[in-house]
Amino acid sequence: MQFEKVTYIAVPQKYGQKKVGVEEGPKFLEKLGFMNVLEQVAKSVNKKTITEPKTPQELGVTNARNLNEVESVNIELRDTIAKEYDVNNLLINIGGDHSIGLGTIAGVVKAMKPNARVGVVWFDAHPDMNTPENSPSGNIHGMPLACAVGLGPQRLTSIMPHYITPKDIMYVGIRSIDVGEQFEIQDKHIDHFTAEDVKRVGMKEVIEAINKKFVDYDVIHLSFDIDGIDPEFILGTGTPVPKGISLEDSLYFMSEMGKMKKLHSVDIVEYNPKIEEEITGKNVLKCISSLFGIKC
């Protein structure tokens, strides 16, 4: 796989959750060889960095914690992606926590024509479909997809130029599902493969379902939370959940996603090197390499 250009957006965001270190994900992946991977597949690499928010004045528990900081990052990220998005090349966003998923979807939507169909593949242990009213934690990294479909604080939902719909989403790997999220998935009939489903039917069938679902869509956006992978392989992440996707299946998933002609943007999120650096970082790089068809 070869591109004229790959745009890499570093997003050092930690305020969608409470654990320090996830903002250093881009820096540590670069240290482990991420830029070398990009240089193997692109004639040029265009790096952008989103402004890291200053420490909030108050870190008290609310039902939408650090709203100002999450809002500012997602607005800047949306506008950067809208400017850099290119259907002839690839854009990769490295977080940072998964609250950035709102800005990345918003950026793709903003870059496309108003009637374009944007499909979202959400690889994650969590659906991220909470709202401040039903979130057990108040952490906004559990809310980005809710905001993208129009549920949540107006300051966040308004970041979307227009909302995607629940039918535009395909979940892969979910297994830690809050009550409000379960209601939305069932009520809105959101397509999904739990981690248990993946083990039962095989990742090949998941890929076939993704291709079939998005056959009439204009573009696909992949948001890849590393906690979708089983903690046996991913130690350095803030909210690990047992019984996840195997590393082998994750590498196959990424290699097949990378072959999709409609995929032009990817998020890699929730790598926290302060929790564990080397094993997790190397496995994340393997996933990124597989996306580009590079054998690990």
UniProtKB/Swiss-Prot annotation:
Its EC number is 3.5.3.1. Optimum pH is 8.5-9. Gene3D superfamilies: Ureohydrolase domain. Its cofactor is Mn(2+). Transmembrane segments: none annotated. Substitution of the loosely bound surface exposed Mn(2+) with Mg(2+), Zn(2+), Ni(2+) or Co(2+) results in similar catalytic activity, substitution with Cd(2+) and Cu(2+) reduces catalytic activity and substitution with Hg(2+) and Ca(2+) inhibits the enzyme. Inhibited by L-norvaline. It catalyses: L-arginine + H2O = urea + L-ornithine. The keyword Repressor does not apply. GO terms for molecular function: arginase activity; identical protein binding; manganese ion binding. Optimum temperature is 55 degrees Celsius. Active up to 70 degrees Celsius. Pathway: Nitrogen metabolism; urea cycle; L-ornithine and urea from L-arginine: step 1/1. Binds 2 manganese ions per subunit. Keywords: Arginine metabolism, Hydrolase, Manganese, Metal-binding. L-arginine binds at N130, S137, D178, D227, T239. Disulfide bonds: none annotated. GO terms for biological process: arginine catabolic process to ornithine; urea cycle. Mn(2+) 1 binds at D124, H126, D225, D227. NCBIfam families: rocF_arginase. Belongs to the arginase family. Catalyzes the hydrolysis of L-arginine into urea and L-ornithine, which is a precursor for polyamine biosynthesis. By depleting host L-arginine, a substrate for nitric oxide synthase (NOS), prevents the production of nitric oxide (NO) by host activated macrophages, and thus allows the parasite to evade host immune response. Monomer. Homodimer; dimerization is dispensable for catalytic activity. This is Arginase. It comes from Entamoeba histolytica (strain ATCC 30459 / HM-1:IMSS / ABRM). The gene is ARG.
